[in-house]
């Protein structure tokens, strides 16, 4: 599957790849999804076919994530995606800029790309080149990461209310599970931020950008610098809430241990009483004395157990 875009009046317009394309020089972005397929075969225009074939057949160095060679500038960057369990995951996108055209190759749809392509009419390319388009995508990526951090903040506030209440111990399992999930997302956000920072620094170092794009790239770097402390605070807050939850759980466990001690005290007391070797013990002469003692021990242990179970203390 391909998404092909032309530049007209500094705006991007999607092209239907089955149509005849007459302005190949204005093609600025070819977005390839699942590039291992043979979808380029149905594109009728020979020159466009060669462009896409070039991108699919060129040898991409899988171990080097940022490099420049005769085929152009190459950047291998991470973006958020969702796996089959609808969990957030980091997936790779290959970027190549060759002859003024941006080629992107990815295995599936990413929220950032869908978001950007959905509102193309709002994106004005001032310089109208592939580098500006690449910076646009990284900016949208940062906006998405910012939204994720804000969502984590909101979720942590809700979890904080549950944990600090200290009265809903039965909900702590879910709270601790949610904290672990948020911590995992936080680490992936950090990886994305550092990865984007490296990619933009590489772009600045390897390409002589116009002054406006140089400033644009530096603004994105500054935004990353501002987001990193917020992401670090997420880890601090998660650690604090986890320790608080574990503290309440330990208190509850100690309380339950005390309750168990109380539960087994009555039958132990009864058993100890009838274990005394005194000569005068009327119950020893009763034919029903032993069964009565056993029943009394069972009832004295069972009654507190049922009561504590009813109170959700066990």
Swiss-Prot record:
Note the site residues: Essential for ion permeation: 254
The answer on whether this UniProt entry bears the keyword Membrane reads yes
The GO terms this record gives for MF are: cobalt ion transmembrane transporter activity; magnesium ion transmembrane transporter activity; nickel cation transmembrane transporter activity
Main localization of the protein described in the UniProt heading = membrane
Asked if the record carries the keyword Cell inner membrane, the reply is yes
Q: Which UniProt keywords apply?
A: Cell inner membrane, Cell membrane, Ion transport, Magnesium, Membrane, Transmembrane, Transmembrane helix, Transport
- Entry-linked Pfam families: CorA
Q: Can you tell me which family this protein belongs to?
A: Belongs to the CorA metal ion transporter (MIT) (TC 1.A.35) family.
This chain's protein is named Magnesium transport protein CorA
Q: Which organism is it from?
A: Blochmanniella pennsylvanica (strain BPEN)
Taxonomic lineage from the root: Bacteria, Pseudomonadati, Pseudomonadota, Gammaproteobacteria, Enterobacterales
């Amino acid at each position: 599957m391909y998404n092909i875009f032309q530049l007209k009046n500094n705006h991007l317009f999607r092209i239907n790849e089955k149509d005849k394309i007459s302005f190949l020089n204005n093609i600025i972005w070819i977005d390839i999804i699942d590039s291992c397929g043979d979808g380029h075969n149905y594109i009728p225009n020979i020159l466009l076919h060669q462009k896409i074939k070039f991108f699919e057949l060129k040898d991409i160095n899988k171990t080097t994530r940022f490099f420049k060679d005769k085929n152009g500038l190459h950047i291998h960057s991470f973006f958020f995606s969702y796996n089959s369990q609808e969990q957030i995951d980091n997936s790779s996108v290959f970027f190549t800029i060759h002859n003024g055209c941006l080629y992107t190759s990815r295995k599936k749809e990413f929220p950032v790309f869908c978001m950007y392509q959905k509102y193309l009419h709002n994106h004005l390319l001032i310089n109208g080149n592939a580098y500006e388009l690449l910076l646009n995508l990284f900016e949208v990526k940062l906006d998405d990461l910012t939204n994720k951090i804000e969502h984590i903040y909101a979720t942590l506030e809700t979890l904080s209310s549950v944990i600090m209440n200290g009265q809903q111990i039965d909900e702590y399992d879910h709270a601790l599970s949610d904290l672990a999930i948020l911590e995992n997302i936080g680490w992936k956000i950090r990886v994305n931020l550092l990865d984007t920072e490296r990619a933009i620094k590489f772009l600045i170092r390897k390409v002589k950008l116009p002054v406006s794009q140089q400033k644009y790239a530096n603004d994105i770097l500054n935004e990353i610098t501002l987001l990193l402390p917020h992401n670090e605070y997420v880890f601090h807050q998660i650690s604090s809430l986890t320790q608080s939850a574990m503290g309440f759980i330990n208190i509850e466990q100690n309380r339950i241990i005390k309750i168990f001690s109380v539960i087994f005290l009555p039958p132990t007391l009864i058993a100890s009483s009838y274990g005394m070797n005194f000569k005068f013990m009327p119950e020893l002469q009763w034919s029903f004395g032993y069964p009565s003692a056993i029943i009394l021990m069972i009832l004295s242990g069972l009654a507190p157990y049922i009561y504590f179970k009813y109170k959700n203390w066990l």
